[in-house]
Amino acid sequence: MIPETYLNVYIGFLRYAAPVLVILLLLRCFKPLLTFRKEPEIWAWLMLQDGSKIPVTHWENTVGRHRKCDIRLDFPTVSRNHGVLTRYDDGSWTVSDTDSSGGVLVNGEKVNICALHPDDVIDIGGIEMMLVPISRHQEERLAELRSKGTGLGYNLANVFLLTVFQFLCAVGYLLSAGGEHVQSVMLGFGGIMVCQWLLLLFYVCIRRTSYEVETIAFFLCTMGMCAISAVVPSDSTKQLVAMVLGIILFLMLGWCLRDLERAKKVRYLAGIAGIGFLIITLLFGQEYYGAKNWLVIGPMSLQPSELSKVCFVFVGASAMDRLLRNRNLIVFIVYSVMICGCLALMNDFGTALIFFVAFLVIAYMRSGSVGTVGLAITALGFAGVVALKIAPHALQRFNSWRHIWEMPLDAGYQQTRSLMCMASGGLLGLGAGKGYMRSIFAADSDVVVATICEEWGLVIMVLMVLSVVALSFFAVRSAAVGRSSFYVIGACTAASVLLVQVILNALGTVDVVPLTGVTFPFVSNGGSSMIGAWGLLAFVKAADTRQNASFAVRILKKGRGQDA
């Protein structure tokens, strides 16, 4: 048994050491993600008949009269969005028509989509041109000039800092527990340490050395393990298994997204799986606290809607040649209505809101129309009024919103206690295992930010939120140089889903928005939530175009006609 004096000394040391370590770690992770250069890349030239040439700066390029087109042809015979010019991994090119009025011709023949060969003459709205791709040598030069990802040494230092922080956390909870739950705490924190080092080793083997995105995710997983160790230490093994499954899903999606054509094919399976998960839950799920969103299989219980988020992002992402066709947008709208309809029948309005935000992001990125988004928001307003009329569970949440101190022993019990515990934690927290949130319902999930804030302080809680904000900014910055709209839409939508979850969880805890029961990605206790968060992270990682950074960008082998 550790004397109380020694325990207090260690906890006091940890209260000051932890914020310093976390600030240093996250600054090192944030800097390369938010400051990398966005160099324009030229992959080919369009040679016009008058001798002028237009640079082709993306792998997918819209061609038309609209000012937002990548390749703008300001002629009255050219449609606003006339066609798409696409490059593939093997260096080949295609041109496709996007339901334009004049059509696209190649060597005088009208085409819907056509592979391009040297000396082919492309006719767009009567404007003839030839595509001249860059040479292999120029492509190698482009790869050399691309922003370099951080090196192995840099990321080794980051993971070492994180490991030190994890070790200090584990010791703090072991000492506070007084010999209880030793195995659970050691397995939980030790398992995260092993996983993060093994994943880094795997990256080294495949020559990918940038590891900031994953380091941020492992930091958030560590804070989640802290909350579990404080509230329900026996759940640490379950959460560790979920994290391992999430990492496997992350790598599987990475392999799938590495080949854009393969990703397009898997998208249809993802669509079937996404709606299938919800239908199965609707038929066989069990209702807890007003929402029928749990599927119980023997000793296991899961929320399939968390996995449906990943499928929804996969379905929403689309290549440019299909992006501009109204038929595809209509199909996606119908699919979205089916998803939200299932969630409404399940009374899972928090998750439905997240799906709707994802839909807004995808709809805007697909159409570029603010009017489309405005119409969708108006529809949400009407749907929300109807939902509050027919669902007493949702109405109760809104009745207590902004009135929790008027009913502190009833509907406001959870949030009022959370606010008091957060206030008692202050900037640096009470210390590992010294909080009182363990007696509050869902202290490790719905109101997990209060548990972290009480024991680790407001500083670390805010850094948790900023971690997800940084991932979102990184996704937006990567979009400017994205190789394909598939990656751009996927990354921005996934980052938006993660960010909205954080907003609903954190602000719901402090009664700024209604408490929806939405989880904090990577932090909240819940296997389905953990797996889904890692799945969404794969889309953010895939959008990274820095040199040797992402598993979605192949490494160019010099002097050879193929990529690694």
In which residue ranges do the predicted regions lie?
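Hydrophobic alpha-helical segments of polytopic membrane proteins
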Residues: 326-345, 349-389
